[in-house]
Amino acid sequence: MSIVTTSFDMMSQKTGTTHDKEMLISGLDHVNLLVPPQTLHLAYSFYASTLGLAPAVVPASCKAHLAWFHIGNSGQQIHITSQHYLSQIQLKAQTESPRHPCFKVPSEDKLNRLQRLIWALYESGGEGAPVYCDEPGNDNAGQGAAGDFPKRFFARDYAGNRLEFTL
């Protein structure tokens, strides 16, 4: 058994290992998000209609509890799983979790438009509306006084999944 020791240099933000090794991971294929049972129609509404992600083909045997969406032409996807066996405690923990995917938006104009769109849906409420969105025009996304972070905002979909949008 071989043990690999890693280090992280905060100044250069480079990770070093004690031996050279070929890169084994070439990218990220998908991120899976959970939603309550019987709500895949809301996932299609939010992720396809609001965010503009293109639905992908799901295996026929899984259509009742899965929805997949392409993220542009990147080859990456968002998978949505409707789990009938999730307890209310598990669903509550999900809605309070800081874990999140971060979506890259091509321009500041489109980022601002998307934030206004999600904010309007949040404000309107109702079934399928986001349960949270950073208010447009406020520095509530943690930009920091020094501008340490790129322009971004956070929202939570109708099921409480935390989502980040950035340049």
Which residues are covered by each model-predicted region?
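Short glycine-enriched loop/turn motifs at secondary-structure junctions
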Residues: S26-G27, Q94-P98, A146-G147
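A short, acidic/glycine-rich surface segment
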Residues: Q13-T15, A64, Y85-Q90, N138-Q143
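Core segments of cupin and vicinal oxygen chelate
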Residues: E22-I25, L33-I78, S82-Q83
